[in-house]
Amino acid sequence: MRLPRPLFTTIFLTALCGLAAGAQAQAPDTRQQGQVSTLQLPAGEGAIDAAQGSVQFIGTATVLIRYQGFTILTDPNFLHKGDHVHLGYGLTSERKTNPAIAFDDLPPIDLVVLSHFHGDHFDQLVQKRLNRAVPIVSTRQAAASLEKLGFTRVTGLSPWDRLDVSKGEARLRVTATPGRHGPAGVAALLPKVMGSVLDFGADPAAPDYRMYISGDTLVIDDIKTVPERFPGIDLALLHLGGTRILGVVKVTMDGKDGVRMMQVVRPKKTIPIHYNDYDVFKSPLEDFAREVKAAGLEQEVVYLAHGETYTFTRAKR
């Protein structure tokens, strides 16, 4: 990556200010309840299978989630090894891996859950080729950008806002959770991000399965509220990688942060993603595995290679 020196200085000094000012630059979100939007999907064929679901790791932050008739795609990135994405402010990053599935081989998608609008999460191929009528849920900032690109079924959420999705008799609730893409000062220069809680099933008080996706965030105080509002998380997908701007300023979790996130959110199982696909990722999966072992959490982590699938069953409440 190359960056003009004046811009480097600006970003670096802003980072230092953000580290010093901390939470002053971004007040915590204290809302008790967010806004609720709804999405009605065409009913699928056949009975709802609530017994078993799956998560397939495609690469970077892209996974396919299948459960109860829903097929959900997260942070779609289908560039190949050697391709570059633009990250803003003149920054680019090179992809080091290939996706496990080609874009053309995707199944029909019911919903895209997008943590934020960044080139390594919604790449130029996806921007050009994804059907404009595919429903997408993301931050309000991302929603505005997506609508400018012609996407017609976009829902923008702020923290604690919720999208209620129905597909025949199947029900899904997607709730946006807090996230911050780096130290406070730097995060102000980057796209707004969100985590998300996916609750499957008709009973909001006792979902059939509860999943947390961190998004590109550090472990900030606001995330402590996630397990308070959503106890009993069955599976967490954590965006790791220790991404560093110019190799200096950390803007996503590294291995140690990932373990801290597990300890805060307290999921029953965790799958690490977003860790080795781009050259801006500076913390390899081995860092996380080492920290997991040191913390005695090995039985709570599932490691997936690109293309591998984790299957789960309805949770017991």
What positions do the PLM features span?
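Bacterial N-terminal signal peptides that target proteins for export
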Residues: 1-11
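Bacterial N-terminal signal peptides
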Residues: 9-19
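Metallo-beta-lactamase
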Residues: 27-50, 109-120, 138-209, 270, 291-315
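Pre-active-site segment of Zn-dependent metallo-hydrolases
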Residues: 40-47, 70-113, 124-129, 182-186, ...
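Conserved beta-strand hairpin/beta-sheet module of binuclear metal-dependent hydrolase folds
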Residues: 48-101, 189-215
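Cap/insert and terminal regions of metallo-dependent hydrolase folds
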Residues: 95, 135, 141-144, 218-306
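Mobile, glycine- and charge-enriched loop segments
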Residues: 106, 121-136, 190-195, 199, ...
